[in-house]
């Protein structure tokens, strides 16, 4: 988890991984050092199950667990009658029908049925009836509710879902024509996942939320669901700790539920840190980045089809030390570090080559023999470090490719200029260039970049621009090729938000330019960064971080003083906005209803670094980049 890691704690990533390994081991705890071959089995999952497993377990890890084959539930599958099958699926009507069909077709030797979320009694009866009809009752070995309906992306970050994410999207929650029944479904979906999250975490939180928002609806429902489960002592999911490592053994965690509407500028912001940039400008999804490799300009014969670009995928995982160290670093630092890693690798590689050539010398002359004995030990250590060296080379190549792809976007779209300008707008610093000039500059950014910038200006302005000014801006945006639908929605949102409360403030300036980057980089660098500003970040809390800080540290602040307070462990649910507990919290989960982003996540990570012994987890109903968010705003603006 973020913050200093205590020996006894297990991150949500570790907990969900342990739960998955136990499930793949037929729901028996998986022992690392157990001797003997694992039992070979097939894994059958739906898309939900696939999305939960893929960021946590590699194909090799699955094979080590005895999974020889992993197949989608709704794909065409041949019978493998002598092998047990582990199912990991959502308990939907469609999935249950297919599962019953598998039983009827007698596809496998035995069936271990694991449901991502709790299965209803009636659906369980459907399976029992199908098993009876197919004479397969004895083959259904186990049926389990796993409560794993969320996706862990980092030790300290999770999202609710990836499939059907439009169901819980910002657009879905903020649609003006949403019916009460539809809203109930959205809220129930979010609450089910949050409930699974707390079951896996093994803790009952104290809940705080803002009033009159979707976050409040989630809080009320989650409080009720936790309360009901705790009351049923025999079946309560919070009595034992399956891992035996109390994450929150001494103190319960705080859950802060915030609504995306408290801050619409951050998700549109151009960013400057590595992970957030990768998510903003590349195709980065469930910890995997997909790059199109340019195949170079080749003269195709006339009339021939143009060559297709190769797609290459890279997994950016916790095992990748470079990624772990630099995902939160400003981009110029990343480029410099890749270059340094490359140089140190080349030096090591040269050493291995040199030693190898010495070993190949004729053993006649004395010089060679004495050198040989000196170097045997060196060579042994060099050869033993060869796998490590090759892994280092793989990571360097990976990050060279990813960072180069990011840099191409920065240079082509002047993203450093946008980032710096937006930071000034958000922190109310004097602007050195008029907004109209930036929008009208044909060389600066795509129409979407310009739209993002203008929306941030519009959202952050204490006073909305006059109609005359607004028309001028709209004309410049239209001339630049922008679609004005997102602005339509933001205008309505701002008018409504103004009635409700004051706009979010973003603190003081957070960047200081350090001169042009070309001075920082070595002349021999892979990264030609001329003209790109070397902007250095200064820690400044974003609205979500500020709200968390107020509630975690029990600070009195007009922004959070009227937040509702729920304690599912209290016998009667009397909502008191005054917390009983006056001591600050050590652990907290911030959950954004309506979608989150890596900028906010990174801001929380940086905030907690200074807090000794405290931990934060960041969660959101979906994680979107600015392009995806603008699309949702655009759809809302067209209504």
Swiss-Prot record:
Alphabetical keyword list: Cytoplasm, Endoplasmic reticulum, ER-Golgi transport, Golgi apparatus, Membrane, Phosphoprotein, Protein transport, Transport
Annotated localization: Cytoplasm; Endoplasmic reticulum membrane; Golgi apparatus, Golgi stack membrane
Residues found modified as Phosphoserine: 34, 300, 525
Keyword Protein transport recorded: yes
Pfam families in the cross-refs: Sec1
SUPFAM superfamilies per the UniProt record, alphabetical: Sec1/munc18-like (SM) proteins
Signal peptide: none
Family annotation (InterPro entries): Sec-1-like_dom1 (IPR043154), Sec-1-like_dom3a (IPR043127), Sec1-like (IPR001619), Sec1-like_dom2 (IPR027482), Sec1-like_sf (IPR036045)
UniProt topology in membrane: Peripheral membrane protein
Alphabetical GO biological process terms: negative regulation of autophagosome assembly; protein transport; regulation of protein transport; response to toxic substance; vesicle-mediated transport
Primary location group: cytoplasm
Coiled-coil parts of chain: none
One cellular component (GO) term of this entry: Golgi cisterna membrane
The family this protein is said to belong to: Belongs to the STXBP/unc-18/SEC1 family.
Complex and partners: Interacts with STX17. Interacts with STX5A. Interacts with the COG complex via COG4.
Function: Plays a role in SNARE-pin assembly and Golgi-to-ER retrograde transport via its interaction with COG4. Involved in vesicular transport between the endoplasmic reticulum and the Golgi.
Protein name: Sec1 family domain-containing protein 1
């Amino acid at each position: 988890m973020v913050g200093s890691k205590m020996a006894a704690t297990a991150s949500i990533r570790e907990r969900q991984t342990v739960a998955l390994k136990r499930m793949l081991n037929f729901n028996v705890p998986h022992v690392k050092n157990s001797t003997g071959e694992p039992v070979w089995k097939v894994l059958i999952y739906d898309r939900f199950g696939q999305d939960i497993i893929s960021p946590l377990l590699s194909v090799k890890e699955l094979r080590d667990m005895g999974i020889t084959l992993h197949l989608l539930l709704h794909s065409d599958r041949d019978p493998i009658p002598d092998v047990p099958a582990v199912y990991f699926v959502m308990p939907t009507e469609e999935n249950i029908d297919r599962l019953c069909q598998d039983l009827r077709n007698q596809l496998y030797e035995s069936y271990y049925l694991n449901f991502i979320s709790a299965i209803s009694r009636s659906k369980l009866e459907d399976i029992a009836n199908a098993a009876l009809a197919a004479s397969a009752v004895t083959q259904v070995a186990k049926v389990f509710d796993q409560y794993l309906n969320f996706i862990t992306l980092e030790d300290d970050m999770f999202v609710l879902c990836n499939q059907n994410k439009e169901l819980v999207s910002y657009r879905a929650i903020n649609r003006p024509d949403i019916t009460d029944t539809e809203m109930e479904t959205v809220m129930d979906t979010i609450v089910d996942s949050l409930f699974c999250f707390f079951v896996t975490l093994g803790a009952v939180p104290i809940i705080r939320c803002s009033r009159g928002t979707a976050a409040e609806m989630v809080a009320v429902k989650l409080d009720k669901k936790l309360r009901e489960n705790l009351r049923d002592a025999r079946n309560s999911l919070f009595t034992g700790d399956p891992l035996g490592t109390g994450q929150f053994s001494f103190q319960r965690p705080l859950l802060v539920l915030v609504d995306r509407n408290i801050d619409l500028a951050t998700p549109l912001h151009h960013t400057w840190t590595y992970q957030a940039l990768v998510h903003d400008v590349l195709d980065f999804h469930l910890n995997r980045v997909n790059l199109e490799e340019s195949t170079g300009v080749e003269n195709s014969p006339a009339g021939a089809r143009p060559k297709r670009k190769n797609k290459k995928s890279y997994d950016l995982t916790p095992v990748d030390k470079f990624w772990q160290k630099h995902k939160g670093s400003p981009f110029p630092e990343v480029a410099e570090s890749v270059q340094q890693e490359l140089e140190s690798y080349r030096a090591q590689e040269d050493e291995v080559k040199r030693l190898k050539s010495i070993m190949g010398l004729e053993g006649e002359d004395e010089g060679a023999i004495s050198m040989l004995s000196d170097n045997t030990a060196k060579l042994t250590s060099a050869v033993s470090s060869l796998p490590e060296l090759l892994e280092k080379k793989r990571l360097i190549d990976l990050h060279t490719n990813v960072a180069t792809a990011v840099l191409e976007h920065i240079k082509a779209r002047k993203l450093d200029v946008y980032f710096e300008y937006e930071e000034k707008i958000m922190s109310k610093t004097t602007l050195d260039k008029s907004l109209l000039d930036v929008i009208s500059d044909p060389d600066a950014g795509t129409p979407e970049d310009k739209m993002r910038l203008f929306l941030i200006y519009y959202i952050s302005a204490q006073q909305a621009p006059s109609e005359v000014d607004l028309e001028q801006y709209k004309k410049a945006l239209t001339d630049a090729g922008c679609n004005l639908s997102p602005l339509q929605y933001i205008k309505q949102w701002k008018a409504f938000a103004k009635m409700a409360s004051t706009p979010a403030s973003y603190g003081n300036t957070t960047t200081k330019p350090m001169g042009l980057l070309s001075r920082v980089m070595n002349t021999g660098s892979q990264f030609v960064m001329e003209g790109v500003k070397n902007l250095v970040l200064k820690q400044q809390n974003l609205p979500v971080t500020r709200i968390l800080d107020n509630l975690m540290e029990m600070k009195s602040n007009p922004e959070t003083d009227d937040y509702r307070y729920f304690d599912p462990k209290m016998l009667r649910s009397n909502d008191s906005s005054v917390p009983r507990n006056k001591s600050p919290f050590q652990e907290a989960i911030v959950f954004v209803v309506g979608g989150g982003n890596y900028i906010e996540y990174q801001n929380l990570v940086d905030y907690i670094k200074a807090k000794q012994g405290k931990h934060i987890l960041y969660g959101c109903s979906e994680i979107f980049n600015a392009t995806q968010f603008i699309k949702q705003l655009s759809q809302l603006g067209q209504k």
